[in-house]
Amino acid sequence: MKFIDEITLNVKAGKGGNGMIAFRREAHVDRGGPSGGDGGNGGNIYFVGDLGKNTLLHLYLQKSIVGNNGVNGGRKNLYGAAGEDKFIKVPVGTVVYEGQKVIADIVEEKPYLIAKGGRGGRGNTKFKTAKNKAPRISENGLPGESKKLTLVLKVLADVGFVGKPSAGKSTLLSVISNAKPTIADYDFTTLVPQLGLVKYFDNSFVVADLPGLIKGAHQGKGLGIRFLKHIERCKVIANVIDFGDENKNPLQDYQEIRNELKLYNLNLEEKDEVIVANKKDQECFEKKLEEFSKHYPNKKIIAISALKQENLDKLKEALWQSVKNTKDIVFELSEDEEVFINFEADFNVVHLGEGQYLVEGPKIHHFYQRIPLNTHDNLMRFNLILKKMGVWDELIKQGIQIGDSVKIYDYEFVWGNE
């Protein structure tokens, strides 16, 4: 299956159902009152974490998700049914962005609300008052939330294996875990992150073999920055270094890898680290390890041979101790800024010339969507709201005359005395 770890996706929750204008017209019911029911709420869209998924391919092909609309209200005060919620499975470890804001970090197998359905409109029964016992007033259902999202899969593993190509990461993964990665004697055998479960006595933890890094990876060289992001989620970095090749310099390899991690994200520098000195079965190993240890006497270094399966229990113990003592990494959700609604400034009046005026603005648009302008009572309610907001005062201030035209989205009327 193709590995897709970053996609853009449009989501639109369901629209609320419209409220109904209706009156009781039944035999033996004198002066039947309003009986229009409310519309149902639009369906929400949820993302659900799924440990069985490891790619965003299914959503990459889908491109967009549209929620279910609420049903319109009916006669006899019948409420419209709410739109059925949609639950979309995504891999655990997926971070959901709207622009630069993190709106969800999918770290558990549970639903996360992504887009909320629109509220259903009220039917005319809800507008009955002592003064107006037969209202011809209703509301449209509101649109559901619409968002353009970026989904980024950051592999959810406790330990991330990093290192140069052909350092032996895939072989190591295959001998300490249940994973069966591709193993070959050439660079970039691992093309996508490979996960494996490591058991240590009664404990277990997840390791990820990440594609080999080369100098300039943070700028996209090799398999580059695309896979560096997967290390962000790992609690512990296991830096696998080849100490068994006469032509390789473990000290230089280590410094280059650390530098790439530092240049990509300074926080990676602060992660707990275990240096895995691989290929201890080779003749040059001890000499290279001694030289390396002189430069880094305080580093946690575990000497192993993945090929000969030597010293693996000691490595498992070191990794487990690091995992156990490190907190889970969760991406903080962006806090919504507090919004203060100022009705006086929430519209704009534009004089187009030749007796034509345009009124627009977010709050104007909200009420325009909410109130169906199909009855006298609804029109009166809409006009009263505009008057209270100060729209009429602004039109008069700009010099509107009787007979001039006022356009509010698709609604147009002629200015009169009232």
Curated annotation (Swiss-Prot):
<dbReference type="InterPro" id="IPR006074">
    <property type="entry name" value="GTP1-OBG_CS"/>
</dbReference>
<dbReference type="GO" id="GO:0005737">
    <property type="term" value="C:cytoplasm"/>
</dbReference>
<dbReference type="Pfam" id="PF01018">
    <property type="entry name" value="GTP1_OBG"/>
</dbReference>
<feature type="binding site">
    <location>
        <begin position="278"/>
        <end position="281"/>
    </location>
    <ligand>
        <name>GTP</name>
    </ligand>
</feature>
<comment type="subunit">
    <text>Monomer.</text>
</comment>
<keyword id="KW-0460">Magnesium</keyword>
<keyword id="KW-0963">Cytoplasm</keyword>
<keyword id="KW-0479">Metal-binding</keyword>
<dbReference type="InterPro" id="IPR031167">
    <property type="entry name" value="G_OBG"/>
</dbReference>
<feature type="domain" description="OBG-type G">
    <location>
        <begin position="157"/>
        <end position="324"/>
    </location>
</feature>
<feature type="binding site">
    <location>
        <position position="190"/>
    </location>
    <ligand>
        <name>Mg(2+)</name>
    </ligand>
</feature>
<comment type="function">
    <text>An essential GTPase which binds GTP, GDP and possibly (p)ppGpp with moderate affinity, with high nucleotide exchange rates and a fairly low GTP hydrolysis rate. Plays a role in control of the cell cycle, stress response, ribosome biogenesis and in those bacteria that undergo differentiation, in morphogenesis control.</text>
</comment>
<dbReference type="GO" id="GO:0005525">
    <property type="term" value="F:GTP binding"/>
</dbReference>
<feature type="binding site">
    <location>
        <begin position="188"/>
        <end position="192"/>
    </location>
    <ligand>
        <name>GTP</name>
    </ligand>
</feature>
<dbReference type="GO" id="GO:0003924">
    <property type="term" value="F:GTPase activity"/>
</dbReference>
<feature type="domain" description="OCT">
    <location>
        <begin position="339"/>
        <end position="417"/>
    </location>
</feature>
<dbReference type="InterPro" id="IPR005225">
    <property type="entry name" value="Small_GTP-bd"/>
</dbReference>
<feature type="binding site">
    <location>
        <begin position="305"/>
        <end position="307"/>
    </location>
    <ligand>
        <name>GTP</name>
    </ligand>
</feature>
<dbReference type="InterPro" id="IPR036726">
    <property type="entry name" value="GTP1_OBG_dom_sf"/>
</dbReference>
<dbReference type="InterPro" id="IPR006073">
    <property type="entry name" value="GTP-bd"/>
</dbReference>
<protein>
    <recommendedName>
        <fullName>GTPase Obg</fullName>
        <ecNumber>3.6.5.-</ecNumber>
    </recommendedName>
</protein>
<feature type="binding site">
    <location>
        <position position="170"/>
    </location>
    <ligand>
        <name>Mg(2+)</name>
    </ligand>
</feature>
<dbReference type="Pfam" id="PF09269">
    <property type="entry name" value="DUF1967"/>
</dbReference>
<comment type="similarity">
    <text>Belongs to the TRAFAC class OBG-HflX-like GTPase superfamily. OBG GTPase family.</text>
</comment>
<dbReference type="GO" id="GO:0000287">
    <property type="term" value="F:magnesium ion binding"/>
</dbReference>
<dbReference type="Pfam" id="PF01926">
    <property type="entry name" value="MMR_HSR1"/>
</dbReference>
<feature type="binding site">
    <location>
        <begin position="209"/>
        <end position="212"/>
    </location>
    <ligand>
        <name>GTP</name>
    </ligand>
</feature>
<dbReference type="InterPro" id="IPR014100">
    <property type="entry name" value="GTP-bd_Obg/CgtA"/>
</dbReference>
<dbReference type="InterPro" id="IPR015349">
    <property type="entry name" value="OCT_dom"/>
</dbReference>
<keyword id="KW-0378">Hydrolase</keyword>
<dbReference type="InterPro" id="IPR027417">
    <property type="entry name" value="P-loop_NTPase"/>
</dbReference>
<dbReference type="GO" id="GO:0042254">
    <property type="term" value="P:ribosome biogenesis"/>
</dbReference>
<feature type="binding site">
    <location>
        <begin position="163"/>
        <end position="170"/>
    </location>
    <ligand>
        <name>GTP</name>
    </ligand>
</feature>
<dbReference type="InterPro" id="IPR036346">
    <property type="entry name" value="GTP-bd_prot_GTP1/OBG_C_sf"/>
</dbReference>
<keyword id="KW-0547">Nucleotide-binding</keyword>
<dbReference type="InterPro" id="IPR006169">
    <property type="entry name" value="GTP1_OBG_dom"/>
</dbReference>
<feature type="domain" description="Obg">
    <location>
        <begin position="1"/>
        <end position="156"/>
    </location>
</feature>
<dbReference type="InterPro" id="IPR045086">
    <property type="entry name" value="OBG_GTPase"/>
</dbReference>
<keyword id="KW-0342">GTP-binding</keyword>
